[in-house]
Swiss-Prot record:
Protein name: Regulatory protein E2
Subcellular location: Host nucleus
Lineage top rank: taxon: Viruses
Residue ranges, annotated region (DNA-binding domain): 312-396
Family statement: Belongs to the papillomaviridae E2 protein family.
One GO biological process term: DNA replication
Annotated InterPro entries: E2/EBNA1_C_sf, Nucleotide-bd_a/b_plait_sf, Papillomavirus_E2_C, PPV_E2_N, Reg_prot_E2, Regulatory_protein_E2_N, Regulatory_protein_E2_N_1, Regulatory_protein_E2_N_2
Protein source organism: Human papillomavirus type 50
Main subcellular location of this protein, as a coarse class: host cell
Annotated region described as Transactivation domain, given as residue ranges: 1-208
Quaternary context: Binds DNA as homodimer. Interacts with protein E1; this interaction greatly increases E1 DNA-binding activity. Interacts with protein L1; this interaction enhances E2-dependent replication and transcription activation. Interacts with protein L2; this interaction inhibits E2 transcriptional activity but not DNA replication function E2. Interacts with protein E7; this interaction inhibits E7 oncogenic activity. Interacts with host TAF1; this interaction modulates E2-dependent transcriptional regulation. Interacts with host BRD4; this interaction mediates E2 transcriptional activation function.
Pfam families: PPV_E2_C, PPV_E2_N
């Protein structure tokens, strides 16, 4: 802006930008380039309004001006959308047909945020399995997201009993809506039924104290038009909630506990045979942190248990913002793969005393021994605004 600007010249420029926007709206274009031009015009319009308000003008033309902070925020939103659209335009999906509504601020801010979406469909949830106690959620046939390297990917929007999510090309599944928090508000039993695309997913929860990630019985609706491949995708893997991990169902929990008891029994018998051979001794430095199975629950003295648990693998728990942790995980996995044994996806605690999907995410990193963990901390810099805690697990 120059000092020569007057209210009349600003009004003319302001109205010119509005004319550009109206022409682009009436054009009803499916070309992404036109939508980039639209948001560029929006940015210029809001910059003019911001400047005029700062110059103590109350209106431009016949239009009253909002507070300067409102125009400033709208200008920032326009810049954000314009930059994202320009990046999308250069990707493999820039030549696809796009409507202006698919490139709107409302669509960009709708869950999952900062992703473009196409072809919305309704997912109806019956809380307490009551047809009169329902709430509609919106999922999308296609979701466009950027990875850690700002590359765009096109994936399917998926639905399961836990919520709405999409599966990244890395295999990680990201929930952008969980039903369990709403079930505690709008329901009493902790049960709900999910209905979408002529398909019904029934909860098999028998107690209100069950986890939100309990098992579900899926039944097709009256139509057979449901895409089976989508069912396979939504039922495969271990989805994480923006919230990156899914706790096991009751059935898998039973199998896990039974398997753990069998491992404990086998491990105890194996250690007992070693004891009979004179192997009942403290772990050597090389053995510390090397164990990958569970210490026996019974039959060990306190000293013997301490000796056995000394072999448990050491871990680090890193806590911080989810996207930062995911980017950091990708970087160190590419460069320092020899400094750790394995690493989890980003995950969050759930439960009445946690912040759920609004809280910080965590990464769990396991090591061969404490020396390797120390080497990792000394070599790999932690991302900003993160904390770490040390610990051991009795098995991996």
């Amino acid at each position: 802006m120059t000092q020569m600007e007057t209210q009349e010249t600003l009004s003319a420029r302001f109205l010119a930008q509005q004319d550009i926007q109206l022409n682009l709206i009436e054009k009803d274009s499916k070309n992404l380039k036109d939508h980039i031009d639209y948001w560029e015009s929006m940015r210029k319009e809001q910059v003019l309004a911001f400047y005029a308000k700062k110059e103590n003008m109350s209106r431009l033309g016949l239009q009253p001006l909002p507070p300067a902070k409102v125009s400033e925020q709208k200008a920032k939103d326009a810049i954000r959308i314009q930059l994202l659209l320009q990046s999308l335009y250069k990707s493999d999906f820039g030549s696809e047909p796009w409507t202006l509504s698919e490139c709107s601020l409302e669509m960009l801010n709708a869950p999952p945020r900062n992703c473009f979406k196409k072809q919305p469909f309704t997912v109806t949830v019956q809380f307490d399995n009551d047809p009169k106690n329902v709430y509609p959620y919106i999922c999308y046939e296609y979701i466009y997201y950027q990875d850690d390297r700002d590359k765009w990917h096109k994936v399917k929007g998926l639905v399961d009993h836990n919520g709405l999510y999409f599966k990244e090309v890395t295999g990680d599944s990201v929930y952008f809506k969980l039903f369990q928090p709403d079930a505690t508000v709008y329901g009493k039993s902790g049960q709900w039924t999910v209905i979408f695309k002529n398909k019904t997913i029934h909860s098999s929860v028998t107690s209100s104290s069950r986890s939100a990630f309990g098992p579900a019985d899926e039944q097709p609706g009256p139509s057979t038009s449901y895409d089976k491949s989508q069912q396979e995708r939504s039922g495969s893997g271990q989805p994480k909630a923006l919230q990156d991990t899914e706790p096991p169902t009751s059935t898998s929990t039973v199998r896990l506990r039974r398997g753990r008891r069998e491992r404990e029994h086998h491990s105890y018998r194996h250690r007992k045979s070693q004891s009979e051979l004179g192997a009942d001794s403290a772990p050597t430095p090389e053995e510390v942190g090397r164990r990958s199975h569970t210490v026996a629950a019974h039959g060990l003295s306190r000293l013997r248990r301490l000796q056995e648990e000394a072999r448990d693998p050491p871990v680090l728990i890193i806590t911080g913002q989810q996207n930062n942790l995911k980017c950091w995980r990708y970087r160190f996995s590419q460069k320092y793969a020899d400094l750790y044994e394995c690493c989890s996806s980003a995950w969050k605690w759930l439960g009445p005393k946690s912040e759920g999907y609004r809280g910080d995410a965590k990464l769990l990193i396991a090591f061969k021994n404490p020396e390797q963990r120390l080497s990792f901390l000394n070599t790999v810099g932690l991302p900003k605004n993160t904390t770490y805690s040390m610990g051991h697990l009795d098995s991996l």
